[in-house]
Amino acid sequence: MVRLITYPSIDADNYLQKKTLDDANVSVQVAQVLETIRCRGVEAVFEYTKRFDGATVNEANFRVSEAEIDEAYSKVDPEVLAALRRARDNIRRYHEKQLRPSWIEPEADGTMLGQLIRPLERVGTYVPGGLASYPSSVLMNAVPAKVAGVPQVVMATPPGKDGSINPYTLVAAREAGVDEIYRMGGAQAVAAMAYGAGLKAVDKITGPGNIYVTLAKKQVYGTVDIDMLAGPSEILVIADETAPPAYVAADFLSQVEHDVRAAAVLVTPSEILARAVEGEIQRQMDYLPRREIMEQALKDNSAVIVVKDLDEACEVANRYAPEHLEVLTKEPFALLGKLTQAGAIFLGPYSPEPVGDYYAGPNHVLPTGGTARFYSPLNVDTFMKKTSVIAYSKARFEQAADDILALAKCEGLDAHANAVAVRIEK
């Protein structure tokens, strides 16, 4: 079911070569949706919602009312609500540690240089929906935005066919401090938030979605900022002979239940463990739902890679640059410094990926598809902008003038040079 690959090899090289996220046909469809909404506004959003979600949305029910959110509280399990609040508090505490103050540094001659670090004014967050419930995605996007100080956080989530929003999604939104909630999903939601169709336009859009949402975010980038381009979920597990096969198998399956495009990778120097994990995967799938999805994802996208030693395992992990990286070895912290490319690293047998996905505090909006090489997890800085401050004194200006003139003339920008020259006292 799961391919077995020896590293290094051509098979390993081929497997570790990441696939592109782009889909030409979907890109064209998304572009049409964006252009239609840009030109026609919110009425086009309503039409697409009817076509794609089967829900009737209009001016009267587009924005979720406070009364509907109040009612949602009566529909949720009190134990789940308590767990959501504890998770929210963990997420808030973790992200508060990321806050940095603005700074301005005066110098002896009166010059001042600095940086203002301030929150964005208005952020839109996308939460997958319909009949499904993803309250954890609400918390992971909205709580850091509020920690950053964003005054207006807008949420878009697709309605069910009856127009309803899952009550857990609504409750999580209020608990996280979301200010406005709209019934819309897909590329049309991204377009509405970016172009201001039926609501005030946002400055940035965050949150996961399907390929239509992801490519819509890609196409509106520049009109608004985005967090990242998220692809299918993935996990890579580095394990040695001390790892319990049942743990590795369970963590594999926790990822591939997401989607037939999800991927799970085991990298191990132990062929005995590799065989044991294969057996455990089969055993655990017998009592889990979504078997067809898991089998397809394991067959199409997943692998067991056998390496010489743990140093080689780290090399493979860094090439793959996974969204989630688990280390189930005798000395997991010994590998931490060698693992340089990952969205999140989970160390030890009691740090399975769901601990981070739901509860511990670090963000679960993570780079996928190898983009952990240059993207970071969603964080407080995601919702901040930085402005440079320059206040030169007369003495510093006169001291630097000749250097600035030389550089401006070198680049052939005479008006730049003139802006300095007119200030030099003769």
UniProtKB/Swiss-Prot annotation:
Is Metal-binding one of the keywords UniProt gives this record?
A: yes
Which PANTHER family does the protein's record reference? HISTIDINE BIOSYNTHESIS TRIFUNCTIONAL PROTEIN, HISTIDINOL DEHYDROGENASE HDH
- To which protein family does this belong? Belongs to the histidinol dehydrogenase family.
Summarizing the function annotation, the protein's role is: Catalyzes the sequential NAD-dependent oxidations of L-histidinol to L-histidinaldehyde and then to L-histidine.
* Cofactor: binding comment: Binds 1 zinc ion per subunit.
- Provide a GO biological process annotation: L-histidine biosynthetic process
- Where Zn(2+) binds, per the record, is at Q255, H258, D357, H416
Q: Which organism is it from?
A: Heliobacterium mobile (Heliobacillus mobilis)
For molecular function, the Gene Ontology terms on record are: histidinol dehydrogenase activity; metal ion binding; NAD binding
UniProt binding sites for NAD(+): Y126, Q188, N210
Q: Which GO terms describe its cellular component?
A: cytosol
Q: Which reaction does it catalyse?
A: L-histidinol + 2 NAD(+) + H2O = L-histidine + 2 NADH + 3 H(+)
Q: Which residues form the active site?
A: E323, H324
- According to the lineage, what is the superkingdom? Bacteria
Q: What is this protein called?
A: Histidinol dehydrogenase
Q: Which cofactor does it need?
A: Zn(2+)
Q: Which NCBIfam families match?
A: hisD
Task: Summarize where substrate binds, as residue positions.
Answer: S233, Q255, H258, H324, D357, E411, H416
For the keyword Cell cycle, the answer is no
Which Enzyme Commission number(s) are listed? Answer: 1.1.1.23
Which of UniProt's keywords are assigned here?
A: Amino-acid biosynthesis, Histidine biosynthesis, Metal-binding, NAD, Oxidoreductase, Zinc
Q: In which pathway does it act?
A: Amino-acid biosynthesis; L-histidine biosynthesis; L-histidine from 5-phospho-alpha-D-ribose 1-diphosphate: step 9/9
Catalytic EC class: oxidoreductase
